[in-house]
């Protein structure tokens, strides 16, 4: 078992993993990979791993891996960032689907999000395009990939998506679930003295409960998680420091 980042870079930190993978493929035909497609610390936080997941699975197949366990959000309430799409992409790639990632994503989004599909794809690509370094499965909202500019662009796109589908339809509910990822990112990055912060937290958890989401942190009750968000924040703009940090009221 080797913990690795989101990219299999033969010249970077993942070189040893790739070396071991190739080595094992030469001595066994029963090679299995346990991979991750989720942020366990923040289920709702955007976790742009689709492109890396696509490339990694293709590489696994090329090397001769027999099976892949692509672990995601296992909480009963679901609602994590793009859970359904990630499961669909992985399932297609693990069969004999040789289409491009864009084709598979469009097929899913057209069927799942309806008229909002083009905006959802734009939203997905906004975060995927912003990955410049490593993506970690315990990243926080103060990660270097999340900026005020990115948050504002996400707000515009996801609101366009909501406006493009009719309230009360299954497509609207699907988009609303994705909207949680923006709302969560926005809320947990607010300063404790931000005007209307309490109202924003109320809005976030009201929607979380309305959609039946039961966990937003791994193995943590929703009640505890709500208390954490109400009393603390993720600090922004702390150079070279991207782990969880709380300022308590």
Language model segments and positions:
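Structured mid-domain segments that build the active-site/substrate or prosthetic-cofactor binding neighborhood
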Residues: 3-118, 122
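Catalytic domains of carbohydrate-active enzymes that cleave complex glycans
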Residues: 64, 90-249
């Amino acid at each position: 078992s080797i913990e690795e980042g989101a990219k299999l870079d033969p010249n970077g930190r993942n070189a040893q993993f790739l070396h071991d993978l190739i080595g094992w493929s030469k001595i066994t035909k029963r090679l299995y990979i346990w991979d991750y497609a989720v942020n366990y610390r923040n289920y709702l936080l955007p976790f742009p791993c689709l492109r890396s997941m696509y490339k990694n699975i293709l590489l696994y197949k090329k090397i001769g891996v027999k099976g892949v366990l692509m672990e995601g959000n296992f909480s009963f309430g679901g609602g994590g960032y793009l859970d359904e799409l990630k499961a669909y992409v992985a399932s297609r790639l693990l069969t004999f689907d040789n289409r491009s990632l864009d084709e598979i994503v469009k097929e899913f989004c057209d069927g799942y999000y309806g008229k909002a599909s083009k905006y959802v794809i734009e939203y997905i690509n906004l975060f995927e395009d912003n990955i410049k370094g490593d993506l970690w499965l315990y990243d926080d909202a103060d990660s270097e990939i999340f900026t005020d500019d990115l948050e504002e662009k996400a707000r515009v796109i996801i609101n366009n998506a909501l406006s493009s589908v009719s309230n009360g339809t299954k497509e609207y509910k699907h988009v609303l679930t994705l909207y949680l990822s923006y709302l969560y990112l926005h809320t947990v990055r607010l300063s404790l003295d931000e005007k209307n912060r309490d109202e924003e937290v109320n809005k976030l958890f009201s929607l979380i409960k309305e959609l039946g989401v039961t966990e937003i942190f791994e193995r943590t009750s929703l009640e505890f998680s709500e208390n954490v968000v109400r009393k603390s924040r993720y600090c922004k703009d702390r150079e070279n420091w991207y782990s969880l940090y709380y300022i308590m009221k």
